[in-house]
Amino acid sequence: MPRVKTGVVRRRRHKKVLKAARGFFSGRRKHFRKAKEQLERSLVYAFRDRRQKKRDIRKLWIIRINAACRLNDINYSRFMNGLKLSGLELDRKILADMAMNDSAAFASLVATAKAALK
């Protein structure tokens, strides 16, 4: 069998990894082995953090809703329970947006929730 040389394939593979490692610091950008290891690690971080991002956004919505609720003399859990009892089904994204941008409408929701709790 003839001898197979990997020059072209290796060059292409190295270029692909080093191109993806642009923006990394020091040897993690310049040296193939370190760049490859860091690239694998960064892809793991990216995978994990795409899921973490969803949790963080939801936490932020809950914090915003709770802050607006406390301005209206009710806490978050009682407010959400009151909304559920009154039959209003608004998701946390919409509630957080209302709490930030339309405080009058949010105050009316709080009043509805308080009435349902009594």
Swiss-Prot record:
One of its GO terms (biological process) is translation. InterPro entries: Ribosomal_bL20, RIBOSOMAL_L20_CS, Ribosomal_protein_bL20_C. The keyword Transmembrane does not apply. One of its GO terms (cellular component) is ribonucleoprotein complex. The keyword DNA-binding does not apply. SUPFAM superfamilies: Ribosomal protein L20. Keywords: Ribonucleoprotein, Ribosomal protein, RNA-binding, rRNA-binding. Pfam families: Ribosomal_L20. GO terms for molecular function: rRNA binding; structural constituent of ribosome. Binds directly to 23S ribosomal RNA and is necessary for the in vitro assembly process of the 50S ribosomal subunit. It is not involved in the protein synthesizing functions of that subunit. NCBIfam families: rplT_bact. Belongs to the bacterial ribosomal protein bL20 family. HAMAP family: Ribosomal_bL20 (MF_00382). This is Large ribosomal subunit protein bL20. It comes from Aliarcobacter butzleri (strain RM4018).
